[in-house]
Amino acid sequence: MKKLKIGIIVNGNFVDKYTHQLARWIKSNNKKLVSTSFISIEKKKDLNFINKKILKKIFFKLIIFFENLLLQFHQIHKSHLKKIDLRKVIKNKIIIQKYKIGNKYLFKNKDIEKVKKEKFDILIRSCGEIISEDLIKTTKYGILSFHHGDYRKFRGSPAGFWEVFYREIKTGFMIQKIDKTLDFGNIISNGFFQTKSFFFIKSS
């Protein structure tokens, strides 16, 4: 039986512990799955955009700081923010870059060709980027993505925050296959779990 070739899309070398666990799981199932490369989306920072958002970023960093202190009392979740070098599991990195045309971000043709040469069966999105159609077309079966939140109510980041803010009883999640509408796709699985008092606990 032919092995499924899987790639993970990230932002840089260091990833959260959940992406690292996923990479290790793929490696451990080497009779059915194979992952020889990961894709890192990297782009130049827009300084004007950063300056416009600086107050929001400072405020959110404070929330993260205090919630992270609270997480240290939860043995299971205390490493929620820990970053791990993905290259320890998957050695080869493919760097691709985005460029902007109007309100759209696309990838350079040479980068798309690099991804095509890998002949991935499936890509898994584990980054903060909206995936454009040119990257979707590089795989045999498409790109899978996990989302926190009930998509009928909340579509924006940060994950797990808005349900706490609006005091929702439950928090949704879904796994979807991304399509050309970019921010939506075909839902493969979805469900709900109880909303916790702090969004870091809920997103961990």
Regions found by a protein language model. Give the residues of each.
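One-carbon transfer enzymes
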Residues: 1-204
